[in-house]
């Protein structure tokens, strides 16, 4: 898969992105968290410790609050 494929998947799946401390929370359309999480892992895996996807929510753990802020900015740019 190409980066464009993952970007498109993310944009079609995600409703919102926010962060608190060293966590990023991504709200997705129902059933789309797992595919969106794969996209985030592929595109931004080097910016995080790990990720966990439920049905409509993704939790990402980063190294610190600054990394969470940077990742949130990158993810919101994809949605813009």
Q: How would you name each of these model-derived features?
A:
Residues 76-80:
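Ferredoxin-like alpha/beta domains used as RNA- or RNAP-binding modules
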């Amino acid at each position: 898969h190409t980066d464009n494929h993952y970007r498109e998947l993310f944009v079609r799946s995600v409703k919102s992105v926010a962060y608190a401390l060293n966590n990023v929370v991504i709200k997705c359309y129902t059933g789309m968290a797992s595919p969106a999480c794969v996209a985030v892992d592929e595109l931004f895996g080097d910016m995080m410790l790990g990720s966990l996807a439920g049905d409509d929510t993704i939790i990402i753990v980063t190294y610190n609050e600054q990394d969470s802020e940077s990742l949130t900015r990158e993810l919101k740019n994809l949605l813009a």
